[in-house]
Amino acid sequence: MRAAQTVKAAGVSRAARPVRANVVCKAQKVEFGQAAAAVVAASALVAGSANALTYDELQGLTYLQVKGTGIANTCPVLEKGSTDLSELSAGTYKLENFCIEPTSFTVKEESVFKGGETEFVKTKLMTRLTYTLDAMSGTLKVGSDGSAELKEEDGIDYAATTVQLPGGERVAFLFTIKQFDGKGTLDNIKGDFVVPSYRGSSFLDPKGRGGSTGYDNAVALPARADAEELLKENVKSTKALKGSAVFSVAKVNTATGEIAGVFESIQPSDTDLGAKPPKDIKITGLWYGQLSQ
C-alpha cells in the first residue's frame, strides 16, 4: 500500500509501512449480522516500532516534511502505555483526534467452483494515500464492570476508495464508520454504522439520468422508459446502507489520555445509485484516539 522507501523528517527516520501487522495478537471470533469476522485484540500494538510516528512526532513535522511521503495517511501510534485495560478508570470520556488507518481490504466473492462457498479475497488498492479517516470525535463510556460504549459523532469520517479484484474488476466504496454506535467490553466493542451513498443525488450517469436532476429515462429508449428491467437504471437511489464493525483497545496511556487498538469492519460497496447489488467489503487496520473528561 505504501512505497517501500525511507522518509527522514525532523530527525525521525521512518520506513514506509507496507504492512503494520507485525503485531503480537490474540485471535477472537466475533459475528455481526450475516457476516462473520475475526478481530484481533493486540497484546502489543506496534509501539516503539521504527516504522511508526507518535502524535507529538507527527505534530512536529512541517508541511514540506510531510508532502509526498504518505505520512499524512497514517495514524499516530502509542509508544508508551499499558496493555492492562483495567488501568482505564470508569467514566465518560470525550474521544478526540480519533483516527482509523486501514491495513487490509478484502472483498467477498463467490467461489469459482460450482457449489463452493463465498469467501473474502485479497485486493489491490487503487486509491492513492487518502483513505485514512482522521480528526474524528466521539464519546467512550467505560463501566466499572468492564463494559464499554463507543460512539463516533463528527470529523473526516468517510473516504472514497477503490480496490481491484484478482480478475481485474474494480470495486468502489465509501470507507466510513459514520455514526458508529457500539457496545461490549474494551477488547470487543461491536456495533453498526451508516454507509452513505457513494454518489450524490445530483450525479448524472452516462445517459444523463440522476436522482434530483437530469433525464427520467434513457433518451434513446423512449418507448421502453417504463420497462421493468430498466427501472433500477432510471430510478436512482441514494439510500444509506448499514455496516458493522468491531473495535478492540490494545493499549492505553492514562498519563497522556492516549488510546490505541485494532479494528475490523464489514460494509457494502457502491451500488451505482441502486443499479447493482453491493459487495461486502472487509476492512482491517489500526486506530488511535485521545481521551479527556
Swiss-Prot record:
Compartments, record wording: Plastid, Chloroplast thylakoid membrane
MF annotations from Gene Ontology? oxygen evolving activity
Query: Which UniProt keywords are present, listed alphabetically?
Result: Chloroplast, Manganese, Membrane, Photosynthesis, Photosystem II, Plastid, Thylakoid, Transit peptide
Which InterPro entries does this entry report, sorted A to Z? OMP/PagP_b-brl, PsbO
The answer to keyword Plastid applying to this record is yes
User: Transit peptide extent?
Assistant: 1-53
Cellular component per GO, a single term: chloroplast thylakoid membrane
The alphabetized list of GO BP terms reads:
photosystem II assembly; photosystem II stabilization
Main localization of the protein described in the UniProt heading: plastid
Query: PANTHER family per the record?
Result: OXYGEN-EVOLVING ENHANCER PROTEIN 1-2, CHLOROPLASTIC (PTHR34058)
Could you say which protein family the record assigns here?
A: Belongs to the PsbO family.
Function summary:
Stabilizes the manganese cluster which is the primary site of water splitting.
- What this protein is called in its record is Oxygen-evolving enhancer protein 1, chloroplastic
Species whose genome carries this gene: Volvox carteri (Green alga)
